[in-house]
Amino acid sequence: MATSVLDSENCRISCQPYSKWRDKLLPIIQKTAENNRHPFAENVDRALLDSKAFLFLSEDGFVALKPFDGDKVCVLFAYSFTQGATMKYQPEIEALSRKIGAKSIVFHTALEGAFIELCKRLGYRKTSQQEHISTWVKEIG
């Protein structure tokens, strides 16, 4: 399997086979879902196993991206072992999304407070709210 790599001044992420990393990453995904009262772990796991989403690793975290509807990318999950994952990975997520012709990036979150303010500064807008889960979209092209 060919490995796709994006380089920037701040981050280097590479596409990796989920099956190779599942035993290490799935517990992180599950714990995060539990902590946020947002039952997304099974959907993330299944999308990665079925190759409907793609796993990108960096030295300090990972992100799962799922193309959909021909011109959109959903950030199914993003995690960093250090602070600042959103700021750090946003340029790479946008570059990968543009590379496949995406016009927008979507994510769902239970996070609030400072994270929401950061999302607004990065150009995302809230498009819906169901219970404590909000959906955010950023137009990129």
Task: List each model region and its residues.
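Conserved donor-binding loop and adjoining core beta-sheet/short helix segment
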Residues: 50-85
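Hydrophobic beta-strand residues in large extracellular and virion-surface proteins
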Residues: 63-65, 105, 136
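Short amphipathic alpha-helix that is part of the acyltransferase structural core
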Residues: 1-39
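Active-site rim helix/loop that mediates acceptor-substrate recognition in acyltransferases
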Residues: 33-54
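Conserved catalytic-core motifs of GNAT/GCN5-like acyltransferases
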Residues: 125-137
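Short glycine-aromatic motifs
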Residues: 53, 121-126
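Short glycine/proline-enriched coil/turn segments at helix->beta-strand junctions
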Residues: 57-61, 101-102, 132
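Acyl-donor binding region in acyl/amide transferases
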Residues: 71-122
